[in-house]
Amino acid sequence: MAVPKKRKSKSRANSQNHVWKREIVKQARRAVSLAKALLGGNTNFLLVSPGPTTPIKPNPKKQTGRRPRSQRRRT
């Protein structure tokens, strides 16, 4: 017969959630710091290319969405 698992205590769940949230905050701070450095030009460890000189044209042959009924595979 199936036996339900033990419930995790509220304090343990809160503790684990706090660890997750702390890591998220740390990553967010790093991202904001990097963005500030890039916008301010205060970084020399990252090479930023100026972007393409000619605009990139979309591929006209690329199909989007579903195929027409006549071109669908029959299974």
Swiss-Prot record:
GO terms for cellular component: chloroplast; large ribosomal subunit. Residues 59-75 have a biased composition (Basic residues). Keywords: Chloroplast, Plastid, Ribonucleoprotein, Ribosomal protein. InterPro entries: Ribosomal_bL32. Coiled coil: none annotated. GO terms for biological process: translation. GO terms for molecular function: structural constituent of ribosome. It is found in: Plastid, Chloroplast. Residues 49-75 are annotated as: Disordered. Belongs to the bacterial ribosomal protein bL32 family. This is Large ribosomal subunit protein bL32c. It comes from Nephroselmis olivacea. The gene is rpl32.
